[in-house]
Amino acid sequence: METIKALEKFMEFDRLQKDCSDKLDREKERRMKAEREIARKNCGGNPCERELESERSNVKRLEYQLDAEKEKVKFYKRELERDRYLSSRYLTSSSDPHEKPLPNYTFPRIKNVSPLTTEATGSVEVAPPSTDVTEPISDVTPSVDVEPEHPPAF
């Protein structure tokens, strides 16, 4: 469902990009016509220069808008590709496509461990690996009793 929504967003931004591109082309044509009219009038005064400068700034603004729309389209394309990759890589039953499945790591549990000596003949019992993914791997969390070093004060 999210892929369909992302595709719809992509199509919408693609349409907007084409609209902005068409608008930019129309503005360029209009600017060229205005420049030709100004050259034909040969007015050379300040009002003509201001009009020409405003047309140029308007075209630049439209070019920036078009670039921004292109960046949005690229972003949504990347998001769509990422979602496709994740959905093909992690096929889960959950509805969240960003949720990754937990790896099923199981380690054998060793019971009755005695110190290793040459005279020890006792056997070591190994418990079968657990398949319960909700059970924590280890009940003991390591602790570090070292204080962090502070940098010398200058």
Curated annotation (Swiss-Prot):
The name this protein goes by in its record: 17 kDa A-type inclusion protein
Keyword annotations from UniProtKB, A to Z: Coiled coil
Keyword Coiled coil: yes
Biological source species: Vaccinia virus (strain Western Reserve) (VACV)
Coiled-coil boundaries: 17-85
Chain segments carrying region Disordered: 88-154
